[in-house]
Every structure is written in structure tokens, then in C-alpha cells.
Amino acid sequence: MIKSFNEIIMKVKSKEMKKVAVAVAQDEPVLEAVRDAKKNGIADAILVGDHDEIVSIALKIGMDVNDFEIVNEPNVKKAALKAVELVSTGKADMVMKGLVNTATFLRSVLNKEVGLRTGKTMSHVAVFETEKFDRLLFLTDVAFNTYPELKEKIDIVNNSVKVAHAIGIENPKVAPICAVEVINPKMPSTLDAAMLSKMSDRGQIKGCVVDGPLALDIALSEEAAHHKGVTGEVAGKADIFLMPNIETGNVMYKTLTYTTDSKNGGILVGTSAPVVLTSRADSHETKMNSIALAALVAGNK
């Protein structure tokens, strides 16, 4: 089973190279990531944006623009829409946000004519490689859905399972994270967790095992699960951590990022093609890992 981003990248390189359309590509950190992604055999790219600005940045960072197709579109909104259209028409396999605000970019992703909407809930999946655990940790949703209800959580679980399957985890273990591991009518997230677990038992959620509610320590650690007397397929062995809300997810994401020696990458899924939506605060390595993750999911339709 794949346990690291190096292994993810090796798996991506063993397949046909995918192509990412970069929306408003005149962004130095994004161009550096795209340059190195192609150099390392992870993904090719189509750069959509202001041609002259792209070339100027490319010269600054030692990037040979002749290695990439550039679509000149100085208008930010039109460039974002064009990048998405390249994916929906099959000329690229995934789309990546460049120097454009998130709201404008997502409006293009959800455009009724050329967008990537599927009718399902879009969600963000962050994948972490840590020294402490012998498996990859999938966090969802840490960036997109604020207070998902049961219907959205079903889609969020299915989206994350799709990513896990692409990586090679055949039957991922999903833990709906709550403050406690018992059902409490005053804590709605525990009720959702119980319903998701029963749906998994009945085969309504497929390709994974869902068991909850589970507190974070019990989902992560077999030792903690043993001490608290919690048993089951997921306790202490969870792959996917379903967050009850965006605050919990965002705090956990940033805690792992800034206080542990970890690596991560993340993508938006629930769309007809993967969406790379990184933050300017994300490291170069995180951007590269996110492109690799998107390429792997794009190749596993």
C-alpha cells in the first residue's frame, strides 16, 4: 500500500502523463510548481493568461516557455473560464488555480456551459504523510464546505473514497470525527456519524468502511482505542477523517502542517475532473504534491 508522496509520484510517472490547465498562469510560485512537475514527469501544462507576463516570469525563474503551450488571455475572468473549458472539452485533464481570486476561479469551475459540475457536492481532500503514522491520512473537508449536512457528508465521503481508491487503498476506513465516541442527541455530528455508519453497513455507501462517531485520538491510535475499549474495523486504523465542520478541519490541517514534520497535498473533487486549489501560503512541495494527486485521480476515472 502506498504510504508516501514519493510513492504517489512514482505511480503517476508510471502512467501516461496528464495535462493541467493553469488558470491565470502569471504567478511565480505556480509556474515554478508547473515547471518542476513537467521536469519530474508528473504533468504537462497549458498556461492560460497574459502571455507577456507569463514569459517575463518564466525568464526570471529559468523556465523554458517553449516547453509549454500558452493561451494568451489577459482578462482574468476569461482566462479562468478558458482554462476550465480546456478541461471540459478534453484538451486538458485537470485545472489549477493561478493568480485569480478563489471566488472567480470557482465560478468558472461551476459555469453551466463549460464548467465541471456533476450535480454532486464538491469537496476538498487533503492527504498527509507523517512520520508518526504508517499510513497516509486523508482529511475532508478542511477548506470548502462549511457546515455540511448529512446529504453533503455522503458526497464528501464518496469523493474522498475516490481519491483513496486512485492511490491504491481498496477499502479505506472512514472515521466521522466527533468530540466523543457515543451518540449524543445534543451533538448533531454524532447523529450524522451514526447514520453514515449504518448506511455503510447496509451498502448504501460503497467502497469503504464507515464507523463512528469516533473521537480523533481513537480514530488515529490503536493504543487510545484499546484504552477506551472501543473496537471495530476503523478504531485506531482510520484512513479518512471526516470533519464535522470547516473549523475543525482547518485547525487540524494547519496543526499538522505547522507543528509536525509532514508532507501534504490537496485537491477539490466531486467535479468531472480534479481541481488544484492551493493557497499562496502553501509550500512549493505542497503544490507539487497536489498536482501529482490530481494527475493520479484524473488517470483513475
From Swiss-Prot:
Q: In which pathway does it act?
A: Lipid metabolism; butanoate metabolism
Q: Which reaction does it catalyse?
A: butanoyl-CoA + phosphate = butanoyl phosphate + CoA
Task: Write down the SUPFAM superfamilies for this protein, in alphabetical order.
Answer: Isocitrate/Isopropylmalate dehydrogenase-like
- Identify the enzyme class: transferase
Single GO BP term: butyrate metabolic process
Entry EC number(s)? 2.3.1.19
Query: Which Gene Ontology terms cover its molecular function?
Result: phosphate butyryltransferase activity
Kindly state which keywords UniProt assigns to this record, in alphabetical order.
Acyltransferase, Transferase
Q: Where does the chain cross the membrane? A: none
UniProt cross-references to Pfam families, sorted A to Z = PTA_PTB
Q: Which InterPro entries match?
A: P_Ac_Bu_trans, Phos_Acetyltrans/Butyryltrans, Phosphate_butyryltransferase, PTA_PTB
Q: Which family does it belong to?
A: Belongs to the phosphate acetyltransferase and butyryltransferase family.
Q: What does this protein do?
A: Catalyzes the conversion of butyryl-CoA through butyryl phosphate to butyrate.
**Protein name as it appears in the record:** Phosphate butyryltransferase
